[in-house]
Curated annotation (Swiss-Prot):
Residues 9-87 form the GST N-terminal domain. Residues 92-209 form the GST C-terminal domain. Induction: By amino acid starvation. Belongs to the GST superfamily. HSP26 family. It comes from Escherichia coli (strain K12). One of its GO terms (biological process) is positive regulation of DNA-templated transcription. Forms an equimolar complex with the RNA polymerase holoenzyme (RNAP) but not with the core enzyme. It is synthesized predominantly when cells are exposed to amino acid starvation, at which time it accounts for over 50% of the total protein synthesized. It is involved in the transition from P1 early to P1 late gene expression. Rnk and SspA can functionally replace P.aeruginosa alginate regulatory gene algR2. It comes from the Bacteria. One of its GO terms (cellular component) is cytoplasm. This is Stringent starvation protein A. The keyword Amino-acid biosynthesis does not apply. Disulfide bonds: none annotated. PROSITE patterns: GST_CTER, GST_NTER. PANTHER family: GLUTATHIONE S-TRANSFERASE OMEGA (PTHR43968:SF6), PTHR43968.
Length: 212
């Protein structure tokens, strides 16, 4: 593993063109302004380098000199510590713990619903779609209180949530009624960030082709 990693003089991200976890990491890299190379990986055709570096052959996988990491949250926290500015986690331990809990809940609850919409039966997908829409609208008031997710500053929690919100049209979810204004305002603020725009692959841009 170390020999293969050492062949790369530039930080390299193995990334899926539409993989939501890869998208999280791409946002962090763009936010940090890090110079890196990207290797786009097709799901059923991993390159030999990835096979050699990661026994799971999963994306995202980050190679930084002799270090190889996989699992998006591990990569994101590593990048935030490796490149401290701008910070994407709070300074104080209590706030950091809360942020980690928010990321866990987003993945456990909302990403699970997303996967059910994509992979479940028609009835399962309909139920998950309804639940995800209702839960997002239920928390919408928090987006009217702060520019970002319970914070004045863009954070790793936003890097978790934004890729999911970007994919909502593809999931068949739209918003109207109470909470929609706040939620759409948050989405606009995040989607217009230079780092978010830079993070998008061509395939991800096409998810919202023709939409504002």
């Amino acid at each position: 593993m170390a020999v293969a990693a050492n062949k790369r003089s530039v930080m390299t991200l193995f990334s899926g063109p539409t993989d939501i976890y890869s998208h999280q990491v791409r946002i962090v890299l763009a936010e940090k302004g890090v110079s890196f190379e990207i290797e786009h990986v097709e799901k059923d055709n991993p390159p030999q380098d990835l096979i050699d570096l990661n026994p799971n052959q999963s994306v995202p996988t980050l190679v930084d000199r002799e270090l190889t990491l996989w699992e998006s949250r591990i990569i994101m926290e590593y990048l935030d510590e490796r490149f401290p500015h701008p910070p994407l986690m709070p300074v104080y331990p209590v706030a950091r713990g809360e942020s980690r809990l928010y990321m866990h809940r987003i993945e456990k609850d909302w990403y699970t619903l997303m996967n059910t919409i994509i992979n479940g039966s028609a009835s399962e997908a309909d139920a998950a779609r309804k639940q995800l829409r209702e839960e997002l609208l239920a928390i919408a008031p928090v987006f009217g209180q702060k520019p970002y997710f319970l914070s004045d500053e863009f954070s790793l929690v936003d890097c978790y949530l934004a890729p999911l919100l970007w994919r909502l049209p593809q999931l068949g979810i739209e918003f109207s009624g109470p909470g929609a204004k706040e939620l759409k305002g948050y989405m606009t603020r995040v989607f217009e960030r230079d780092s978010f725009l830079a993070s998008l692959t061509e395939a991800e841009r096409e998810m919202r082709l023709g939409r504002s």
